[in-house]
């Protein structure tokens, strides 16, 4: 009976969010995104872009950030329950730009991050070195975003051993039903002060790679059409953060390959998929710029990547 407490318009919005289309979408081989600068007064040479494509349809936002003028940080919620909204973290830290970070286990007490999480030289969670699919154990070195002590950044396939972080130049060669073995002799010590696992990696040397199978994301919602968050960097070190709305009439969301194409449009050398779905949120100067699952409300998450003015 509680259903009738809601108005017809609210019910209609709910239906549109849950059932935006009966037609199965296919992966686009190219997306002609119309990008334009919508904010250039953020400070420290940061630019916010808005993009749309009515044919897919898609709506997305990207922020271009030069690190010589800005400090980049990985943040962890300090709330009692271990999660905060992106806007709450922006307000606490005075961040000029902040985006949601990695995956986490919702409903656990205490809440736990899925894989590597390191902030201010403190290791909150080691890497998840293995996952199970159909009762088969796969060793993993999933994509991670790392920040060095000099404020430069890197994206690599990473894992941990005895609380030390190691990185590889390529992912383990996992395939469905065919797990790979782990080889630390091919890795190197990753001396980063902050790092966060998410994945999969989308771009490497500007090439679309989308290592979802190797990182063992097969048979998960990660590989489907979703609202998305991503982070990458250009050859000159400038960072690009992006969110793509999804599950809406005006924006269906994107496949991982499509997200890689959008990041490449900003000349990213390397790019990483972050936690998506209803977690995708981008806040600029304290304002939420996107519409998570069609609503101007935010899901609480555990980790974030933020830009703090120097």
What are these regions (language model features)?
Residues 109-213, 220:
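Active-site-adjacent helix-turn-beta-strand microarchitecture at beta-sheet edges
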Residues 23-160:
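Zymogen propeptides
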Residues 58-62, 142, 197-199, 226-230, ...:
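Short glycine-rich loop/turn motifs
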